[in-house]
């Protein structure tokens, strides 16, 4: 296991701990919005800001954990793992700061959250992967190696499909997209025909009815 793989595992643990705090906060709001054991949606209007903050936290955590899981499968891709660790570190900082700010509102123990903030692993991840120098090195590598995207983990067949759609998007759609959106124009035939040739229509219609979805 590489050092970056180890750090990704540590980051996952930290992310999971924050996720539990978010769930505790959600349970607190649910309790406050319940009447006679039933959830009252009208009461939730009084909790719009905390609910928004928690939704944002959960979205960030889910994205970071998904990125981490993906990167752990690519043990030979140093850059991918470094980028994932940078994203995880940024997410840890963002979510924890948001929870600390809303702790009283959502029934969390601010002292416990601050203990997490001073935790050894948390500080190590931030100091290592959220530092200005590290972010600068990632940017330099992206520019220097002309990195356009990360490994897809797709099969050879699906990678060919991805590349085909990528070329269509860049060679056919991109040159026309601004004009279409800016002036609210109809989608031209060149795009519709190309999309049809790629099988973009009828994907949810069973084959027995002339669609592309397997019966």
Enumerate the language-model features and the residues they cover:
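Flavin-dependent oxidoreductase catalytic core characteristic
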Residues: 1-213
């Amino acid at each position: 296991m590489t050092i970056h793989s180890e750090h990704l595992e540590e980051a996952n643990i930290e992310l999971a701990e924050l996720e539990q705090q978010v769930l505790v906060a959600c349970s607190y709001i649910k309790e406050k919005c319940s009447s006679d054991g039933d959830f009252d949606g009208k009461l939730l209007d009084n909790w719009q800001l905390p609910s928004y903050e928690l939704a944002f936290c959960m979205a960030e955590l889910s994205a970071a954990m998904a990125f981490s899981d993906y990167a752990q499968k690519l043990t030979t891709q140093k850059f991918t793992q470094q980028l994932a660790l940078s994203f995880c570190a940024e997410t840890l900082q963002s979510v924890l700061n948001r929870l600390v700010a809303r702790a009283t509102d959502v029934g969390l123990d601010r002292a416990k959250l601050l203990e997490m903030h001073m935790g050894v692993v948390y500080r190590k991840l931030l100091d290592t992967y959220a530092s200005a120098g590290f972010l600068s090195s990632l940017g330099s590598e992206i520019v220097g190696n002309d990195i356009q995207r990360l490994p897809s983990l797709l099969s050879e067949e699906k990678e060919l499909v991805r590349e085909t759609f990528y070329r269509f998007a860049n060679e056919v759609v991109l040159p026309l997209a601004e004009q279409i959106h800016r002036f609210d124009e109809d989608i031209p035939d060149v795009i519709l025909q190309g999309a049809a040739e790629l099988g973009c229509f009828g994907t949810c219609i069973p084959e027995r009815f002339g669609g592309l979805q397997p019966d």
